[in-house]
Amino acid sequence: MVRVPKNNNENQSKAVVRTYYEVEQDSIKLKNKKCPRCGSIMAHHMKPLERWACGKCGYTEFIGKSR
């Protein structure tokens, strides 16, 4: 018998793709950065250190002073 895991993601909110873009009169512009490795959209994190992170390949760019 094969067990199928339960989907517990019903309570979590999903990312809305339309919030990633800024629409002007004749152009559409991406708000976030794109990953230089894989090309997916990167997330901007503020804590514990400010950084840009890719959830797909794990590439991370740290912003600000180094310790």
From Swiss-Prot:
Name under which the protein is recorded: Small ribosomal subunit protein eS31
Cofactor: Zn(2+)
Sites where the protein binds Zn(2+): 35, 38, 54, 57
Keywords noted in UniProt: Metal-binding, Ribonucleoprotein, Ribosomal protein, Zinc, Zinc-finger
NCBIfam families: PRK00432.1
Subunit structure: Part of the 30S ribosomal subunit.
GO biological process: translation
C4-type zinc-finger residues: 35-57
UniProt GO MF annotations: structural constituent of ribosome; zinc ion binding
UniProt keyword Membrane, yes or no: no
Family named by the database record: Belongs to the eukaryotic ribosomal protein eS31 family.
InterPro entries in UniProt: Ribosomal_eS31, Ribosomal_eS31_arc, Ribosomal_zn-bd
UniProt source species: Sulfolobus acidocaldarius (strain ATCC 33909 / DSM 639 / JCM 8929 / NBRC 15157 / NCIMB 11770)
Tree of life domain: Archaea
Entries under Pfam families matching the protein: Ribosomal_S27 (PF01599)
HAMAP family in alphabetical order: Ribosomal_eS31
Cofactor, free-text remark: Binds 1 zinc ion per subunit.
